[in-house]
Amino acid sequence: MFRLEVIRERLKSLVFAGRGLRYLVLKEDSFKFQLLFSFMFIIAGFYFDISSIEWYAQLLVMALVLSVEGLNSSIELLADYVQPNQDKKIGKIKDVAAGAVLVSGIFACVIAFVIYIPHVMALI
């Protein structure tokens, strides 16, 4: 009995998470942009036949960037709910969240350069 209830709760959590992911994909332009880049790098990974270690690194930074972008979007939604008008403190909160996305994006670019520059140079 207890076990079944735990499973039901986990399934409900998955449904809620799915709703959140659906919202990100359908409504958040920044998330769509990051998702597009992720798909482009997946295609590039197959094209250049990157190694397993390179795949791990690439998938890890893709998950990092998409996750941080999702957190940034949730912070922005919450901030707008709490204070719908312009507010310096809310602006600072949003800036810090966006800065976290920038850090993860820069890290992803560094990893992409490390992975792909040798493959591109081999073509030249």
What is each PLM-predicted segment?
Residues 1-74, 82, 86, 92-94, ...:
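Hydrophobic alpha-helical transmembrane segments
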